[in-house]
Structures are given as C-alpha cells and as structure tokens.
Swiss-Prot record:
UniProt-listed CDD domains: Rad51D
Source organism, top-level taxon: Eukaryota
Protein name per the record: DNA repair protein RAD51 homolog 4
Keywords for the protein's UniProt record, in alphabetical order: ATP-binding, DNA damage, DNA recombination, DNA repair, DNA-binding, Nucleotide-binding, Nucleus
GO CC aspect terms: nucleus
Any GO molecular function: DNA binding
Residues binding ATP: G114, P115, S116, S117, S118, G119, K120, T121
Gene name of the record: RAD51D
Subcellular localization(s) per the UniProt record: Nucleus
Primary location: nucleus
Biological process, per Gene Ontology: DNA repair; positive regulation of defense response to bacterium; somatic cell DNA recombination
Amino acid sequence: MAPLKHLEKENPIIDACFQDFCASHGILTIEDFLLHDLYELTAFSQRQTNADRLKEGITLILSLIERQCRPLVNGLKLLEDLHRNKHTLSTGDKETDSLLQGGFREGQLTELVGPSSSGKTQFCMQAAASVAENHLGRVLYLDTGNSFSARRIAQFICSSSDATLGQKVMSRILCHTVYDIYTLFDTLQDLEITLRLQMNVNESRLRLLVVDSISSLITPILGGSGSQGRALMVAIGYLLKKLAHEHSIAILVTNHTVGAGGEGGKTKPALGETWKSIPHVRLSLSRDHKNSNCTISILKHTSLPSGQAAKTLTRKENQQCP
C-alpha cells in the first residue's frame, strides 16, 4: 500500500504535520490507516491544537479510499473506451505488428518471455524507438540491469540522419534505473500521481512504459514459504494494469525462462502460476543462434489465438533504415 507521504504532492492537507500525527499512532501507509480504529483516531485528533486540519486530512483519506473502489462498467462503455482511447502502437517490426494485428494495444500489459540472449532487450529498445518516432509519444524505460543503450536506440531511429529531428525523438525517451521491487513501487506510484496531475495531450502523453526486466526484481522476493513475496508480485501487477487502463498506456515487461522439469530440456516462463494470469498478452521470443533469426509466438492474448508465430528481424547496428 502507498505510504501517506506519496499523497502529499497531490493533497497538500496531508502534510508533514498530519503524517507525524498518524505516525505517532503507527500509521505510515493507507493499509495502516484502514486497519486502525478511525473513531479512536478522530477522538485523538480533536485533542490537538490543529484539530480541524487533522480531521480534514482524515476525511480526505477516506474519500480517496472510496474513490479507489471502482464502479461497475457495462460492456458498451468499455467498447467505446477501447475505440476512443486504446490505440495500437507499432513494435518497430512489421512481422510482429502483423502477428499482433497492429502491435501493442494501449491499456494492456504485454509480457515478453525468453531465455538469456534471445533478444528481449533489443526488442524493447526497438519498440521504444518506434513509439517515440512514429507515434510522437513519450516512453518511460525502467532498466533493471544496466542494459539500456542510448546509442542503440539512436540506431533504431530512421530519422536520425536529420540531427535535429533525431534529437527530438530521443528526448521523448526517458530511462530510469530500478534495482529492487521497492524502488519500482515508488517509481510507479510517483508516475501515477504525475499522470493524474498533468494534461496528457500530443507529445506530452506517455504512451509506452517498459520494465526490462520485471523478473529480475520479483524473483529475489519469492524465496521461502512466506506469502509476502507473492503478495508484492500481485500488487505490482495490479498497479501496472491500473496505470495501463486508466491512462491508456501500453506496458511492456520482460521475463526470463526456467526449466520446466522432466526430460527434453523444456523451459517455461519464470514467476510461476500466480503471475501467469496477470499479463493481458504473453509473447515468447526465441533465437536461432546459428543464423541469429528470432521467432516470436503468442502464448496468451485477449483477442488472438495462441500458438501463432512469426519471424522477427531487428536491425543490425550497421543496417540502414528502409
């Protein structure tokens, strides 16, 4: 759950004074607030010199919690939202776009699964360059393993021969390094607040969010028999899907593979069965190391049959744009 301090930027009434009052009662997060006796908390607030301000803060938090209880929406409204706000974004590869009938869908969480050196990061950078160049939107790239390369991104941009235009496209891509699950939580919660405050129009709108890789952050917290790690994993998944839907963002995350057990050396996506149900779309990327050809296939999709596949081609460093 979000710490109270994350609410201050959008709600000034939840200032340091209010946070200190809550902290004195062991309340640091929204979850703590829900678990506390609110009648007792209100009674304590009335004994303070700034009782009116504290009571206003308590009322505000309750209203914020109530707003998070999403209302029921009928199918017609969902369809209208799909046609009006949820567009497709090119992945940067024609064959993949054809396979996905246009590319990534805004409002959806897409997972790209593949073994090490299969080309997942290259695919992500190519997608980032494509969205920044062709869709005139911003891209936020969360890098968990120092694999992001601005030089490689620039090579994907076909307009790079025009230095001014190339720089403008590059300026639409913002990269943050994220090394643990808690930093990812903070980053996504700050992003949620920022998106709510700003007017998302034209080039200022965030259209693609990349997390490369989500599994490197989640795997370390899944050890042992406790359920806390899985709860954090589900919470991250929920937050990503919430951002995607409410702000019409296409979200792309990468996941590695693990042994499936048994003979034959088969593999399966990491993070287990709990995570399996979270992404809207699940794609598998494999590479033939003899000729460097890549194959992308659909493991799961909301509107397309699984099992379909296509050969992909990511441009080599010395290859010119068509």
